[in-house]
Structure formats: C-alpha cells, structure tokens
Amino acid sequence: MQGWHQVLVIAGISALCTTTVDGASTEDGKAAFERREDTMKRMGRPLYLGIGRVVKGTVAYGPETVVAAETVAALASTLDRTLFPPGSDVAESRIKPEIFTAADPVDQLIAAVKSATVQLVPAVKTGDKAAITAAYDTVADACNACHTRFRKEE
C-alpha cells in the first residue's frame, strides 16, 4: 500500500509543478506581449505622429522632429527576436503564431527596420521635406512588411 502512496504523492507533485510552469509561462507570455506592445508604441508614436505629421504637412518641421527620428532609431536598434517569444500570443495580442517558427524571415524584417531607421536621422536633420518623406516611407514600409505578414487584422 505504501508504494501506491508514493506514486500518488509523486503524481500530485508533478501536477502542481506542471500547473506552476504553465502559469509561469502564461505570465511570461503576458509580460513579453506587454514589453513588445510598449516598444512598438514608443517607436510608432514619434514615427507616425512626430515625423508623419511633418510629412503630411499638418505639423511644421522643428527640433522635435529630429528628436522623434532619434527616438525611433534608438528604439529600432534594440529590436530583436526576443520581442516575439512563443507564448506571447496572448488574447490581447494581434501577433500571428507563425512568427514563432519564422526565425530567418523575422531576422530579415528586423534588419530591414534597423537599416531604414539608420537612414532616418540624417534625412530628418536635413530639414528637406522630400528627403524626410523618402526616409519616413522607407521606415514605414519596413515596419508594415512585418505587420502585414505577422499581425492579425483588428
């Protein structure tokens, strides 16, 4: 009888450990989603509101436009695959699960965003609307390439 008791105790401990691991991974996924969402918002706001409005002509070019470009470039330089870990496709996320198995395409898309944002700051510093527009479009296109492939529609 004591043998069965040990088996039941071990099974119970295993079940508790599994529950704890699953709970931790859900929390880790949620934290990863929140970090990704925060990073994208902190990068998107200065791009679309700070520079995009200058491109559209609804806001005048100024020193804050350069700060916006520097912010976008600084944040883009930190992008890597750790923003997209398996399990971060929580209910609030619009990420497609295909991203978790697409390492090479994700790396290429991240490299394209980084490359585009490196060109953004010098273009914005010129103050030339055509140069700013071209650089802005290149960055927006690079960002949208990833969103188109790996983000669900709203």
Model-derived features with residue positions:
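Sec/Tat signal peptide C-region and signal peptidase I cleavage site
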Residues: 19-25
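The canonical Cys-X-X-Cys-His
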Residues: 139-151
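Extracytoplasmic c-type cytochrome modules immediately beyond a signal peptide or single-pass transmembrane anchor
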Residues: 25-138
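Short Cys/His-rich "knuckle" micro-motifs
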Residues: 154
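Bacterial N-terminal signal peptides that target proteins for export
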Residues: 1-9
